[in-house]
Amino acid sequence: PENHFAGPAALSAPLILLAAAAARTHTIDLGTTSLVLPIRHPVSVAEEVAMLDQIAQGRLILGLGRGFSEDLFDVFEVDPRQKRALFKQSLTRMLSIWAGDPIHQKDDRALYLSPRPHQSPYPRLWIAAFGPLALKQAAAFGCPYLASPMETFAELSQNLAQYRAALKAADQVQPEVVPVMRTIFITEDAA
């Protein structure tokens, strides 16, 4: 996931990393687990994601999140109490832009996104969701929720049930996948 100010563990620019991976690969899908949307301008994200999806020739999966670190919100001057509203506003605008609606209109002149994403109308979207409000928000958009690596299997089962109920309440179709993050360690040492 996107991670700022974490020393060697930092990943502050996941889209740039994926662009490098897209240039070196041809068949694997490429994705973010959680690009932090509330700290970014939705037009910039829509443009960068469309370009990345073109470079990746439709292999992009865009995982989005709201963020959780107080330091992150302080540095980017975002009120953390507004993160859900900003997320909803930004993603709604991005979906509109990717669908071909004008980015901006003044008088008789309209501005549109170019190039559009390779996938139509936009890349596959996953929304990181670790609590009831986030699960409802993912369901409202009809996007798969990206389960936390911190959830136990019992919590995962409970959250999946909440998510499915929220999908039904939002009159959304069950997505084909439920992405789950898990941390694994690979070593030659059996210990």
Go through each PLM region and give its residues.
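Active-site-adjacent structural elements that line small-molecule/cofactor binding pockets in enzymes
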Residues: 1-191
